[in-house]
A protein has these predicted regions:
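N-terminal beta-alpha lobe that positions the nucleotide/phosphoryl donor
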Residues: 1-180, 184-200
Length: 200
C-alpha cells in the first residue's frame, strides 16, 4: 500500500521481504550469487521416499525446516532413519499451523556450529557491512548472547565473509537494513537465511 501511494517505507521493499521470507528461494538466490549453502534438498520436499533417498545421500543427522519458518517452529532434527517419517510429518503439520504453508526442505544438520550474523545497510549505489555478531549461545533456537567480534573467525575468513555478503546484497538490488545469517564450522561458513531488518 505504501509503495502504491509513493510513501517511502524505512526498510526493505515488499519484493525483497517476500524474496527472503521464503527460505528455499533465499537459498537459491544466495547460491546463485556466490554464497556457500548447506548440503540438502534443492527445493521443497513433498514425497517421503524422495526425502529418504536424499537423507541417505547426505547422511544423518538431518534437519527438516519449514520454508516459511522462523523461531525454531516447524524445524525437526532427525538423528536416525527410523524416526524420519514421524518427524517429517510433524514438521509439515507445524509448518502449516504456524505459517499457513506445509512446504519443508531438508539440510545436513551440524552438531556444534557457530551462528554468525552479518548486518548490512544498502542503498541504491552502495552496500556496507556492519561487521559480524556471534550468536551461538542459544536456547530453543533463540539467541541469548551476542558477541562481537566473533572469537572463532580469523581475518581472512572474516574478510571473505564480508565481501561475499556485500556482493550478494548488492546484486539483488536490496535497499535498507538487513541481517544475513550463517552457520560456521571447521573453518567454513554456509548461508542460512536473510532477515530483511536488523536482527536483535
Amino acid at each position: 500500500i505504501l509503495e502504491e501511494n509513493n510513501i517511502k517505507f524505512i526498510g526493505a521493499s515488499s519484493k525483497h521481504i517476500k524474496m527472503m521470507g521464503d527460505k528455499i528461494q533465499a537459498k537459491k538466490i544466495a547460491k546463485e550469487n556466490g554464497l556457500p549453502i548447506i548440503e540438502g534438498s534443492e527445493g521443497g520436499v513433498k514425497d517421503i521416499s524422495q526425502a529418504k533417498e536424499l537423507c541417505k545421500k547426505i547422511g544423518f543427522p538431518v534437519l527438516i525446516k519449514a520454508s516459511g519458518g522462523g523461531g525454531g517452529k516447524g524445524m525437526k532434527i532427525v538423528h536416525e532413519e527410523k524416526d524420519f517419517e514421524t518427524l517429517f510429518s510433524t514438521a509439515k503439520s507445524e509448518a502449516l499451523k504456524y505459517f499457513g504453508n506445509d512446504e519443508v526442505y531438508i539440510e545436513k544438520f551440524f552438531q556444534n556450529p557457530r551462528h554468525i550474523e552479518v548486518q548490512i545497510l544498502s542503498g541504491k549505489n552502495r552496500t556496507v557491512h556492519l561487521h559480524e555478531r556471534d550468536c551461538s549461545v542459544q536456547r530453543r533456537h533463540q539467541k541469548l548472547i551476542e558477541e562481537t567480534p566473533s572469537p572463532v573467525l580469523n581475518d581472512d575468513i572474516r574478510k571473505d565473509l564480508f565481501e561475499r555478503t556485500v556482493k550478494m546484497v548488492s546484486k539483488i538490488g536490496y535497499e535498507g537494513a538487513g541481517t544475513v545469517e550463517f552457520i560456521y564450522e571447521d573453518g567454513k561458513f554456509y548461508f542460512l537465511e536473510m532477515n530483511t531488518r536488523v536482527q536483535v
